[in-house]
Amino acid sequence: MNSMKGKRVIITGPTSGVGKEIALQLAALGADVILGCRDTQKGEEIAAEIISRTSSSKPVVMQLDTSSQKSIRDFAREFRRKHRTLDVLINNAGGNRGTLPKVTSVDGIELTFATNVLGYFLLTQELLDVLKKRASARIINVASAYASDLDLDDLQFERRRFESFRAYAQSKACDRMLTWALARRLAGSSVTANAMTPGLITETALYRHAD
């Protein structure tokens, strides 16, 4: 694989599953990894594991709750204060509430949609200027094979009975659509946007809450 030495990468949701493996692999390739974590204590534990397993420089842990618009803006503001450029943004943080009832975010939005869709969108918008300063930058949105049809008239489950997996599946369909729209918007620029479907990884909260 190509070296990532000198490349600055933000990964959201890096404390388990897909995000953790991405962080490990990119650190091993020499990338300067920034871990956007809701739980910074877990983030520090992952950073220590990355160092021990890859002999890379210490990843930077920053607090980020992608269900909160304020947290996203604070994260982006702090990043821009410290760094002028960004090479790769990996929007991976996501959630599925399993058998738990519907919950809204601090902004009053159904939590799955707030985290998995609006979180991707807002963080990308907040960091687009620093991505565009690189000659070849990447936005990668982690999607899912479980993406399903949308009910555009009831994305917030205000009329339908809330089903956590349906909420997750429609959020991942939105992520695909978001990526397509973003790719068209960025055509001809130095930034490309792609969605990826990683397959099933069982060591995640999403898998544990699947019953």
Tell me what each language-model feature is:
Residues 2-37:
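Canonical Rossmann dinucleotide-binding motif of NAD(H)/NADP(H)-dependent dehydrogenases/reductases
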Residues 8-11, 89-90, 139:
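Conserved hydrophobic beta-strands of the Rossmann-like cofactor-binding core
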Residues 36-40, 44, 66:
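N-terminal Rossmann-fold cofactor-binding loop
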Residues 52-70:
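Rossmann-fold cofactor-recognition segment
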Residues 60, 70, 74-81, 99-114:
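Active-site Tyr-X3-Lys motif and surrounding loop/helix of classical short-chain dehydrogenase/reductase
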Residues 95-102, 109-113, 132-191, 197-211:
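Catalytic loop of short-chain dehydrogenase/reductase
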Residues 124-125, 180:
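A short, exposed helix-loop element centered on a Lys and neighboring polar residues
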